[in-house]
Design a protein with these regions (language model features):
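Phosphopantetheine carrier-protein modules
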Residues: 10-29, 48-54
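Thiotemplate assembly-line natural product biosynthesis machinery
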Residues: 1-17, 68-75
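Conserved catalytic core of two-component sensor histidine kinases
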Residues: 36
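Catalytic nucleophile serine of serine hydrolases
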Residues: 32
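C-terminal structural segments of small proteins and small subunits
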Residues: 52-74
């Protein structure tokens, strides 16, 4: 799942280096607009709804965290 999420994010957001950081939000690499875009892309690609409760820094700080969230939400 991680590889699929990473490939998708690299395609959609080539200006962001998702591979080098494990603190994308904490380091200021992702802002609220970027997170909104990621939510839209993941929702469409994986057919999931990301509830408000899941929109927390920990779920967006790394590709691993994003992939874990997608897997959780897919059931």
């Amino acid at each position: 799942m991680k590889e699929k999420v990473l490939a998708l994010l690299k395609d959609e957001f080539p200006e962001i280096d998702f591979e080098s950081s494990c603190a994308l939000v904490d380091d200021g690499i992702l802002d609220s607009l970027s997170i909104t875009g990621i939510i839209a892309v993941l929702s469409m690609e994986f057919g999931i709804i990301i509830p408000y409760e899941e929109i927390v820094e920990d779920n967006f700080n790394s590709v691993d965290a994003l992939a874990d969230m997608v897997e959780r939400l897919r059931g």
